[in-house]
Each structure stands twice: as C-alpha cells, then as structure tokens.
Amino acid sequence: MENISVVRLLLKLSPPVMLALLIQSIYNIVDSFFVSRYSAAGLTALSIIFPIQLLMTALATGTGAGINILVSRMDGTGETKSQADIVKGGLFSGFFNYIIFACAGLLFIRGYFSISSDQLPVQEQGIQYAQIIFTGSLGLFIESNCTKILQAKGNMLTPMIAQVTGAVMNIILDPILIFGMFGMPESGVAGAALATIAGQFAAMIITLTAVFRIYRFQGKIRLHNCISIYRAGIPSIVMQSLYTLYIVGLNLILKQFTEDAVTVLGIYYKLQTFFFIPLMGLQQVILPIISFNYGAGKSKRVKDTLRYFRELTVGGQVFSSPYFARSFCWFLWHGFFIMRG
C-alpha cells in the first residue's frame, strides 16, 4: 500500500474487483431472463423489488466501507492490536443489519407492493420473492463486511473468487429451481430468490473463512467500535439510499402510464451497471489505499490516488460513452421484447 506507485497499485488491484462486478452484472441479467421465461408478472415484480434490493446493498456495502476505512487506517498508523475488535464489531454489525432489514422488510413489503402495482399476480409474486430475499439476507450482509475487511488488507482475489462463485451458483440454480429441473419442484420466482440466497451464502462462507484465518475472531464486540463503523460508513449508505428513493419515485410515476414502463426501467438499471463497472471497481480499490496512507500521514499519496482515480475514470467514461450508448440502446430495446416473449 505504501511502496508501490499509485498507478501500478490501482492497475494491480482493480482487475479482480472489476471481474467480480462483471460476473455479478451478468447474473442480474440472466436472473431476469429466466424469470421472464416463467412469468411476465414475475419480471415486473423483480423490477419493482430491485430498488429495495439496492437499499439492502447500500446498507451492506456502506457498513463494509466503514470497516474498510477503520482497518486500513489502523494498518497505516501501525495500530494492529485493536483491529480484531473492529472486525468482531463489523461482523456483529452485519448481523444487526440483517435483523433490522429483515424485520422492517417483512413488515412493510405488502404495503410497498400495494402502492407499486395494481396487478394482483405482480403483487403476489413480488411479495413471495421479497420475503425469501429478506429472510435469507444474512449471507449478503456478512459477506459484504468480510469482503471489505479482506480488501482493506489488500486481498482483492479472495472476494473476487467468492463473488464469482456465488454468481455462477446462482446462474446454475436459477433454471433448476424456477422451472423444476432434475427432479426439483417448480418454484417460479421463489426459486429465483432461493438461488440468490444460495449464491450469497456460498460467497459468505468463502470470505468468512478467509477472515477467520487472519483474525481467528479473537476480538471483542465494543459499542464504540460499532458506532465508529457506522459513522465512517454513513456517507456511502446515505448516497446509495437516495439513489434508491429516486428509482422508487420513477417507478411510481411510470406506473401511472403502464407497468411495462416499470419493467423497462428495471431492465435499464441492470444493464446500466455494465457501463459503471470500471468506476465502481476503482472506487472500491481507492478506499483502502487512501485510508492506509491517511493513517500513515502520507498526504501526497492520498492526493495522488484521488488525482489518478479522477483521470482514469473521467477519461475512460468519455472515451467509452459514444460506443456504449448505441449498443446499450439497441440491447435495451431488443432485450425487453426478448424477455417479454
């Protein structure tokens, strides 16, 4: 984190993160495709629940970012003794997030779908999908925190393996559980939800095992550490949550015209992820680099990291936008009709 040049560090650490994000983006599209083959109402239901899943991800990744910042900063200052306490507090925070989100989600999901759709099949399938996702979201919250802990230590490979494993498992299980293949019962959208949960738990097991090898979970859960984690992660949580509210607002507006528009919007945001993979990959990489060097008092490397990040992302987006826009619009238009049959 301190001896390699900033540019080399960014280019070395970013590819595994970007590959994991690419696989996850592909899985999102494949997931929607299989559901659309089963039921058009199911595809609309997934588009409606998508912003709530983003909210769940915002809480998970935001909390993980808080852990990442604290662990990297401690590495920079040489304060390693209390890292185990931060890690233990981070894992507890993941479990706490799960309890809060699962309870709130199960309590309010029926009301959310009642205002988001007037079609009974969409409501029923959406509620069924959401209940499974919320109940089994422990894997997402723990995996996200473990991933950020490993990234804080400069380990980008294990999180990539975990996320790719989870996504591939999800893609394989989707048709089996949705359509009832190989002797499995036909589960429809519930099968898609179960496949998602299975993939998340597979990723959690891989990252949790890697974290255990480093810390052996010897720390103690301390309230002030948990508060520090949320304080460091709250900007990320709030910004991503506002994006979720924006999509929910658009869905409510589009619903007044036709629910097909809501479906198209959901497909659009899943496709849009491909365009932002380089940005999101670099964003995840610079967090531990900046935190480490800030803790070590190396302000020049902090400024250099921000400068190179800005140059790489702006340059990349400007260069790729003209080529991406045309193919993106074509795929969105044709992809909607392919998915709807």
Locations of the language-model features?
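Interhelical loop/hinge segments that connect adjacent transmembrane helices in multipass membrane
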Residues: M1-K12, V189, A193-T196, I205-T244
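Signature of the first transmembrane helix
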Residues: R8-N68, S72, I234-Q256
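Residue-level signature of transmembrane alpha-helical cores of multipass secondary-active transporters
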Residues: L13-L21, L54, G94, I133, ...
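Helix-terminus/linker motif at the lipid-water interface of multi-pass membrane proteins
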Residues: L22, I26-T44, F113-L120, I176-S187, ...
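Small-residue-rich hydrophobic transmembrane alpha-helices
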Residues: L43-L106, L140-P159, L265-W330
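Short membrane-interface helical motifs at transmembrane helix boundaries
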Residues: I100-Q131, S321-G341
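Alpha-helical transmembrane segments of multi-pass membrane proteins
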Residues: L120-N145, T273, L279, M339-G341
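Membrane-interface helix-loop junctions in multi-pass transport and translocation proteins
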Residues: L157, V168-M204, R326-H334, R340
